[in-house]
Amino acid sequence: MSSNLFNPTRRQLLQGTAALAAAGLVGVRPGFAAAVDWKRFAGTTLDVNLVKSPRSDTLIKYLAEFEELTGIKVNAEATPEQQQRQKTVIELSSGKPSFDVVHLSYHVQKRQFEKGGWLADISGYLADPTLTDPGLVENDFADAGMLFAKDGQGVLRSLPFSVDYWIVYWNKELFEAKGLKYPETFEQLVAAAEALTDPSTNTYGFVARGIKNANTPVWTSLMLGYDMTPLDAQGKLRTTSPEAIEAAGLYQRLMTKSAPPGVTGFNWAEAQSAFLQGKIGMWFDGVGFAPPMENPEKSRVVGKVGYGVMPKGPKAHAAGTFGDGIGVTATSEKKEAAYLFCQWAVSPV
């Protein structure tokens, strides 16, 4: 594939949410074909390291089904993103990680994992009919997912767990109260955010990630609307270009004029939590964070949320695409059993 992961084509930016990156939500045990002996590693115990998110919550919810299917015992740990990343780097760098399966954020950790040689080559497993159900083939995954999952030599190092484009979650009730329509342009986005903001009622028009590092995709996603990517074709930074600076100014305005106090310390979890309370007009983040919106046990905005495409920028209409993977550690002594878990984790509902 000729396109560069860190300088994707417009088609790739606009295309990809989960083919599974298709599968997205893990769930009920699929009707796997008999060619795969799912009991082959019965009695094995796997340790699985996950990022806590709506997807990992769903995965853990259905773990008993995998254990019943395979006879494999799974010890799964799901920790918040920043802590999980620290833990994985420390343990993988030691050469003796405590886990067989690891969840990684492609857009943050792909190069680091490849440089460290931390993930096993699973290309052969995907092609092995005794390990992979015939209903799962490479073409089942979105192109963006495979671009993320393969290293520079085309070796498959993980299975795409998600490929998310970014959207705008918007509170239809708050918009209606102000007589506002969903914004179609960046200019309208700013105007709506400021019109919705009323600190006296603790209501704010916009929220997004503000904490260092996690805030980068917010800025770079806005850059796309100026027809600008962070890197050029030679891999050189374009973050000081006029377009990048203008996008940074837009981001700054949204966060300083329309966002709640303390937003500079927010990651996605804090931004999501704020939106769920019903006092935020718009939240800008990945489509994969949608499930809690309609969960009455977690959300005060059930039935009130709109899921909008990214508004059009001054020069382009685009959405950033980000992905997570799930792979087998290179040092695991249970690689094939661990691969069975990865396969199950990305299986269709």
Labelled PLM ranges:
Residues 1-9, 19-26:
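N-terminal secretory signal peptides
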Residues 32-47, 68, 153-155, 176, ...:
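Immediate post-signal peptide segment of exported/extracytoplasmic ligand-binding proteins
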Residues 34-40, 106-165, 190, 302-306:
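Hinge/lid segment of periplasmic solute-binding proteins
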Residues 42-53, 73-77, 100-101:
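Short, well-ordered beta-strand elements
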Residues 61-141, 173, 177-184, 274, ...:
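Extracytoplasmic "Venus flytrap"/periplasmic binding protein-like
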Residues 111, 217-221, 249-343:
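Extracytoplasmic/periplasmic substrate-binding proteins
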Residues 146-161, 166, 187-237, 280:
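Extracytoplasmic/periplasmic solute-binding protein
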Residues 192-195, 199, 234-264, 310:
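Glycine-centered hinge/linker elements that transmit conformational signals in sensory
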